[in-house]
UniProtKB/Swiss-Prot annotation:
It catalyses: L-glutamate = D-glutamate. Provides the (R)-glutamate required for cell wall biosynthesis. GO terms for molecular function: glutamate racemase activity. InterPro entries: Asp/Glu/hydantoin_racemase, Asp/Glu_race, Asp/Glu_racemase_AS_2, Glu_race. Coiled coil: none annotated. PANTHER family: GLUTAMATE RACEMASE (PTHR21198:SF2). The gene is murI. Keywords: Cell shape, Cell wall biogenesis/degradation, Isomerase, Peptidoglycan synthesis. Its EC number is 5.1.1.3. It comes from Carboxydothermus hydrogenoformans (strain ATCC BAA-161 / DSM 6008 / Z-2901). Transmembrane segments: none annotated. This is Glutamate racemase. Disulfide bonds: none annotated.
Amino acid sequence: MDKASLGIGIFDSGVGGVTVLKELINLLPGENFYYLGDTAHVPYGSKSKEELLILGDAIIRFFLKLGVKMVVFACNTSSAITLPILKERYPVLMEGMLEPLRKNMPAKAKVGVLATEATVKSGLYQKKLMETNKFQEVYMIACPQYVPLIEKGIVSGKEVEEATREYFEPLLKEEVRDVVLGCTHYPFLTETIQKLYPKIQVIDPAAYVAREVYRKLKENKLLGENGGKVQFYVTGDEKSLKNLGSLYLGYNIDRVQKIDLEVIV
C-alpha cells in the first residue's frame, strides 16, 4: 500500500482537539483523518506523567493498528510531557502543539500561557518558549475549571466569565497583552475572553501546528491526494464531541465509534 494514502491520527482527552482538526482539514483537504477523543480519561491536566504515558502508549498502538502515517498530539499536556518519550518508541511521524508554537510565534516582551495544571507543573512549556530568546517573560497560568466546563458544553455564561477573570487577574497585573491558548479546549472560550478583554491578543497555536504537519508530510513525500474523510472515535461519553465538535466544524458528526483502550489508570 502507498504510504501517502494512509490516514493521520489525531487525539486529545476530549473535544478540544477538534480545534486543531479543523485547521488540518482546511490545509490538507486530500488527507483522511482518524480523530480520537479519550473522553473516558478526561481531563488529562490533572493526571501524572506515568498515567499520561500509559494512555499515550495505548493511543499510538490503536492508531498503528488502523494504519497511519502520522500522529498529531492535539493536546498540549501530552505534547509537553509524553510526546518526547513516545516518539522514541514508535516508528511513525509525530507532531505536537509546543514545537510549532515555539518555532513560529513572533517575539513578544511578555506572553501569558493559559494551560492545564499538568502542563504548568511540568515546566516544559515555559522552558521551551524561553529557550527561543523571543520572550523576556513567560507567565504560566493553570486553568483547572476550563476543560470540565467545556466538556459539559458550557462555553459561555457566568461560570466561564468568573473563571476567566480569576485566571487573567495575574496577567493583567503584569500588563501582559499577548496570551497563548495552551490547551486545545480553550479556543471554545475565545469569544468570552475577547468580550471581557478586547485589548488582549489571543493566540491559538492550531494554525502553526497544521502548517508544520503539512511541511513534514511534504518533506517526507507523504502528502495525500484522494482523502477527505474523517472518522471519529471516543473511549467514553460521545456527547461533547457530537455537540460542540459539530458546532465548531460546521457539520454534523453523526457517527462516533466507541473503543476500549484496555488500560487502567
